[in-house]
């Protein structure tokens, strides 16, 4: 049952091959049996089964929609009523929200059943899911490897088929990179497509929620429910609802030959994504995926994104600056960890934050506070914002000659647990291909396209697909065409 996609599970429910309760029970058993992966931080079988029973009642009445009764896991950065919402931090270890995040509420309104909350890097700051206060997550493909971050719990859960789908968030690559490392499909929509209301903030001008699942078609189904205007989020974009599944299985252009469904599609290949730093085995796997696209009729076009290398310093000025502001609310007064012993009020603030935040969060708060301080604001923060605009303009120039941009989601496959923990700069460099997309606010996704070589032969590689603003439906069409021609997205770790 767990090998089925969301679309297949929906058909099974409709044919009464299983009930929503039976489906939920099946996944709950799998979650319990796979505790060693540490993909989940909070599971409540009673809450899950209550939702499943309600879904079965809807289905029995002939009601419900495309997602009714289907299970999903939520990254623990989305607040959920009745479940703890920790953001992977000791600071919020016992926090229970009085309301649901919009993403959670919309998926529940669509009839989906919550399986639990997935592990994550603390406050979404990390690329390996080793920064969680609740322990590191293991990659199901190779338990000596990281699953990526910060949505590593979600990527591991989907890869191990502990859930058919999961929510994630992407600030600088936190959906795409873990999707790549765990061999699943994940999409970061255009900034503002998906409401941030109830998403515990890291960097407000970058944070964006999105789905992670087995396939592009599953992600399209989920995005139909997740996307939409929300007046409670000041950055939410007011646009007409659209069906993200509408191009799936369709040729790129009317009249295309069945064997060349993507004829007319121009794929931009940035020179900067294929230079020094890209591992040979990743390059070979990406090249093979691009040849598959050529076989489907697409044309490869060289493009340039000249400021790609500046995306790392720009991101690590802007994101920590916003984080230092957002995380100032966690002081042990209204909610969050409070030190047991302290002197005056200022001492309580200091000790509560020192005890509640982990090392990486503290590092980024310090960096952010520094770049926003008097005398450095103009030199660092304002300069970074100017370069951010140039990076966005570079993408628009590239899109004049192509329809989508492709390249690796990460320069390497997943690394060993603990391999980069003592070198934050090396960890930051792992996001070189995803950061610029986030800085520009563009949609991007990762699609499984193969594996590494030699010692990395069990570690997946993800192909990144980047689209222009609001072009998610076309990106999903392009990804879906690849997945109809290949089976990388259907492969599972040994023993699953």
Curated annotation (Swiss-Prot):
In short, the EC number is 6.3.5.7
Q: What is the annotated signal peptide range for this record?
A: none
Name of the protein in its database record: Glutamyl-tRNA(Gln) amidotransferase subunit A
| NCBIfam families named among the record's database cross-references | gatA
Q: What does this protein do?
A: Allows the formation of correctly charged Gln-tRNA(Gln) through the transamidation of misacylated Glu-tRNA(Gln) in organisms which lack glutaminyl-tRNA synthetase. The reaction takes place in the presence of glutamine and ATP through an activated gamma-phospho-Glu-tRNA(Gln).
List the Pfam families hit by this protein, alphabetically.
Answer: Amidase
Enumerate the PANTHER family for this protein: GLUTAMYL-TRNA(GLN) AMIDOTRANSFERASE SUBUNIT A, TRANSAMIDASE
Task: Provide the coiled-coil residue spans.
Answer: none
Q: Which UniProt keywords apply?
A: ATP-binding, Ligase, Nucleotide-binding, Protein biosynthesis
Give the catalysed reaction(s), semicolon-separated. Answer: L-glutamyl-tRNA(Gln) + L-glutamine + ATP + H2O = L-glutaminyl-tRNA(Gln) + L-glutamate + ADP + phosphate + H(+)
Q: Which InterPro entries match?
A: Amidase (IPR000120), Amidase_CS (IPR020556), Amidase_dom (IPR023631), AS_sf (IPR036928), GatA (IPR004412)
Instruction: Name the residues annotated as catalytic in the UniProt entry.
Output: 75, 150, 174
Q: Which GO terms describe its biological process?
A: translation
Cellular component annotations (GO), alphabetically ordered: glutamyl-tRNA(Gln) amidotransferase complex
Q: Which domain of life is it from?
A: Bacteria
Annotated GO MF terms: ATP binding; glutaminyl-tRNA synthase (glutamine-hydrolyzing) activity
Q: Which family does it belong to?
A: Belongs to the amidase family. GatA subfamily.
Subunit composition and interactions: Heterotrimer of A, B and C subunits.
């Amino acid at each position: 049952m767990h090998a089925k996609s969301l679309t297949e599970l929906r058909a099974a429910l409709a044919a009464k091959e299983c009930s929503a309760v039976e489906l939920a029970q099946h996944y709950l058993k799998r979650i319990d049996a796979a505790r060693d992966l540490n993909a989940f931080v909070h599971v409540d079988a009673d809450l899950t089964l209550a939702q499943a029973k309600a879904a079965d009642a809807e289905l029995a009445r002939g009601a419900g929609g495309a997602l009714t009764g289907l299970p999903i896991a939520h990254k623990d950065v989305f607040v959920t009523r009745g479940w703890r919402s920790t953001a992977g931090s000791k600071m919020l270890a016992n926090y229970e929200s009085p309301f649901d995040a919009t993403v959670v509420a919309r998926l529940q309104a669509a009839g989906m059943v919550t399986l639990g909350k997935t592990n994550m890097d603390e406050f979404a700051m990390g690329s390996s899911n080793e920064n969680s206060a609740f322990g590191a997550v293991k990659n199901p493909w190779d338990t000596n490897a990281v699953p990526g971050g910060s949505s590593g719990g979600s990527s591991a859960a989907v890869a191990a088929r502990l859930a058919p789908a999961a929510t994630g968030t992407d600030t600088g690559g936190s959906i795409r990179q873990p999707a790549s490392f765990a061999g699943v499909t994940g999409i970061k929509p255009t900034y503002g497509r998906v409401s941030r209301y109830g998403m515990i903030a890291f960097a407000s001008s970058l944070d964006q929620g999105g789905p992670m699942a087995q396939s592009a078609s599953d992600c399209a189904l989920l995005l139909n429910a997740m996307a939409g205007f929300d007046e409670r989020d000041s950055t939410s974009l007011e646009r007409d609802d659209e069906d993200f599944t509408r191009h799936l299985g369709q040729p790129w252009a009317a009249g295309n030959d069945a064997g060349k469904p993507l004829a007319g599609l121009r794929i931009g290949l940035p020179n900067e994504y294929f230079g020094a730093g890209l591992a040979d085995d990743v390059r070979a796997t990406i090249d093979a995926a691009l040849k598959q696209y050529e076989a489907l009729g697409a044309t490869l076009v060289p493009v340039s994104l000249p400021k790609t290398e500046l995306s790392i310093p720009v991101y690590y000025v802007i994101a920590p600056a916003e984080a230092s502001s957002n995380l100032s609310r966690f002081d042990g007064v209204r909610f969050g960890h409070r030190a047991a012993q302290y002197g005056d009020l200022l001492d309580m603030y200091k000790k509560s934050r020192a005890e509640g935040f982990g090392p990486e969060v503290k590092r980024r708060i310090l960096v952010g506070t520094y770049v926003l301080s008097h005398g450095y604001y103009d030199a660092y923060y304002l300069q970074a914002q100017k370069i951010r605009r140039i990076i966005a303009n570079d993408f628009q120039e590239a899109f004049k000659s192509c329809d989508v941009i492709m390249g690796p989601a990460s320069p390497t496959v997943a690394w060993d647990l603990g391999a980069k923990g003592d070198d934050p700069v090396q960890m930051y460099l792992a996001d070189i291909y995803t950061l610029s997309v986030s800085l520009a606010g563009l949609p991007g996704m990762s699609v499984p396209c193969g594996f590494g070589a030699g010692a990395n032969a069990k570690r997946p590689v993800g192909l990144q697909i980047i689209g222009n603003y609001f072009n998610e439906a076309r990106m999903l069409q392009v990804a879906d065409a690849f997945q109809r021609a290949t089976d990388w997205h259907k492969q599972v770790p040994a023993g699953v």
